[in-house]
Design a protein with these regions (language model features):
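Short, low-complexity, Pro/Ser/Thr/Gly-rich segments in the mature regions of secreted, periplasmic
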Residues: 192-206
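Conserved short hydrophobic patches within well-ordered secondary structure
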Residues: 174-175, 195
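Conserved polar/disulfide-associated segments of primarily extracytoplasmic proteins
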Residues: 10-25, 33, 84-173, 180-186, ...
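Bacterial signal peptide processing site
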Residues: 3-5
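Sec-exported extracytoplasmic/periplasmic mature domains
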Residues: 80, 127-130, 196, 200
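Generic detector of isolated residues embedded in canonical secondary-structure elements
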Residues: 1, 77-78, 194
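N-terminal "mature-domain start" segment
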Residues: 14-25, 29-45, 49-87
Length: 206
């Protein structure tokens, strides 16, 4: 499982608060929606997989489009997508036997800018991972992002990348986290290469 019992309890609480459920149904025809998607992305032939959960496909590329925070995440088409969080900030994806779990989520950073520098905020995020039992063996911090790798409390490998980006005129921090068993290291490295090459995109939408 990709979530701890604590996370599940939090999710159950959020689930009971329907005020937070900001997912709209598709009120125009699918064809009209896809015409708009094509125009936004500058391509032709995007297919809709799951509107509520933001899943689309272009050729053989499956991607998650988070409309609330304006970012895209390319992920392996063989993975099963989950439900977009009720806060609308992310989603999760798993391979067939759940030996690889992929999570992506966004948070607003600009609301904290008066109190913390980005570096201080990154340090707090990393400290939070350590407090949750993650053992970090590799850490790389730049002016606008950090990458950490290591092992989870349960003995899985993990990779996490957080990047500060601007979208809808807001500063957000976008986090991608991958947890995988040692036997799936090769497959996981291929996915990690995608995100190291920035196949996670925050795009200004109008």
């Amino acid at each position: 499982s990709c979530t701890s019992k604590k996370d599940s309890n939090i999710q159950a609480t959020i689930d009971s608060l329907s005020i937070y459920d900001n997912h709209s149904t598709l009120e125009i025809s699918e064809a009209k929606h896809l015409q708009w998607v094509d125009s936004v992305l500058g391509v032709k032939g995007v297919k809709l997989i799951d509107y509520r959960n933001g899943i689309y496909q272009y050729d053989d590329t499956r991607f998650y489009w988070n409309r609330t925070f304006g970012y895209f995440l390319v992920y392996p088409s063989s993975f099963t997508h989950g439900k977009e969080s009720d806060l609308g900030n992310g989603n999760h994806f798993v391979n067939e036997d759940s030996t690889i779990c992929l999570n992506v989520y966004a948070t607003y950073f600009d609301v904290f800018k008066d109190d913390y520098s980005l570096r201080e905020w990154f340090d707090m995020m990393i400290d939070s991972e350590i407090e949750q039992g993650y053992r970090i063996t590799k850490k790389d911090i730049t002016d606008h992002s950090y990458t950490i790798e290591g092992n989870t409390k349960g003995g899985r490998c993990f990779y996490s990348k957080a990047t500060c980006k601007k979208t809808y005129e807001r500063d957000i921090i976008l986090t991608v986290k991958l947890e995988y068993t040692d036997s799936k290291k090769e497959e996981a490295r291929a996915i990690i290469c995608l995100y190291n090459n920035d196949k996670i995109i925050a795009k200004e939408l109008h």
